[in-house]
């Protein structure tokens, strides 16, 4: 694996000079191998090690290199044709392979090659970009988007129209991460490498980026780039120092543990916020 990483790192340093016409065989095969490993879930761009999320930057670099070495090509779809550098993940799947891998894909959901989809996942008409990892039992609801290299945990619900940001455009240092057992409400956006920790509930229409203040009303603490585990979060505003205006923020209205969350439905958690 170290040899593979070295090839990617070296090629990335000279990426501006690489084209589909001049890329060498070693680099092409290395990138192809990484994309295949990401696609199968054998590798992932980020993983939790000893309680901390670690981003494997070289894998992200391989994803970026794939755009340098591949030409656009015609891609067949059910109702249309496409023209892109990245093939679709399910282009060669037959019924037996879908049965074996054990997830559902509702048309016209689109998943790019290099994204991993785990068992018991349901993809409604949605979009999952290259390098993303979607773990077991997760629902990606209608018109939700999972950005490049985003990491989605087990038993997550991404509601209709949710946007999970990617790392490729604009280029971000770390992927956006939604940990296990989280609920992300409809039309919410989580971007710029924000981490939503395990068991959190994000209400409808909440926008979270690195500069978003995440205000805990119980403690008065303000978080940036991280929603603490077990948080119930809604949209809000905080006043300016001079009191003349207010700016958008996200508000942690309560904390819940797994036991409470198991007994109380998501809707009830969001309704009783006073």
From Swiss-Prot:
Keywords in alphabetical order: Acyltransferase, Amino-acid biosynthesis, Cytoplasm, Diaminopimelate biosynthesis, Lysine biosynthesis, Repeat, Transferase
Similarity-based family: Belongs to the transferase hexapeptide repeat family.
Gene3D superfamilies on file: Hexapeptide repeat proteins, Tetrahydrodipicolinate-N-succinyltransferase, N-terminal domain
A GO cellular-component term linked to this record: cytoplasm
Domain of life where this protein originates: Bacteria
Main location (coarse class): cytoplasm
Protein EC: 2.3.1.117
Reactions mediated catalytically: (S)-2,3,4,5-tetrahydrodipicolinate + succinyl-CoA + H2O = (S)-2-succinylamino-6-oxoheptanedioate + CoA
Protein name: 2,3,4,5-tetrahydropyridine-2,6-dicarboxylate N-succinyltransferase
Source organism of this protein record: Salmonella paratyphi C (strain RKS4594)
């Amino acid at each position: 694996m170290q040899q593979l990483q070295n090839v990617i790192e070296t090629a990335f340093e000279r990426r501006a000079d690489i084209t589909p016409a001049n890329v060498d065989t070693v680099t092409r095969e290395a990138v192809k191998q990484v994309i295949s490993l990401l696609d199968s879930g054998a590798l992932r761009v980020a993983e939790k090690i000893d309680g901390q999320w670690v981003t494997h930057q070289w894998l992200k670099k391989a994803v970026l290199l794939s755009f340098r070495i591949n030409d656009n090509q015609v891609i067949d779809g059910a109702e249309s044709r496409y023209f892109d550098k990245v093939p679709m993940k399910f282009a060669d799947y037959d019924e037996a392979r879908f049965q074996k891998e054990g997830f559902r894909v509702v048309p016209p959901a689109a998943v790019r090659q290099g994204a991993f989809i785990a068992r018991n996942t349901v993809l409604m008409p949605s979009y999952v970009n290259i390098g993303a990892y979607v773990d077991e039992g997760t629902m990606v609801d209608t018109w939700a988007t999972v950005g490049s290299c985003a990491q989605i945990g087990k038993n997550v619900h991404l509601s209709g129209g949710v946007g999970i940001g990617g790392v490729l455009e604009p280029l971000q240092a770390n992927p956006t991460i939604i940990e296990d057992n989280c609920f992300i409400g409809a039309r919410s956006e989580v971007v710029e490498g924000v981490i939503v920790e395990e068991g959190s509930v994000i209400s409808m229409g909440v926008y979270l980026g690195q500069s978003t203040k995440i205000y805990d009303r119980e403690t008065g603490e303000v978080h940036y780039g991280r929603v603490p585990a077990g948080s119930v979060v809604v949209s809000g505003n905080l006043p300016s120092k001079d009191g003349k205006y207010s700016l958008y923020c996200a508000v942690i209205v309560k904390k819940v543990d797994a036991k409470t969350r198991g007994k109380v439905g998501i809707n009830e958690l969001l309704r009783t916020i006073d």
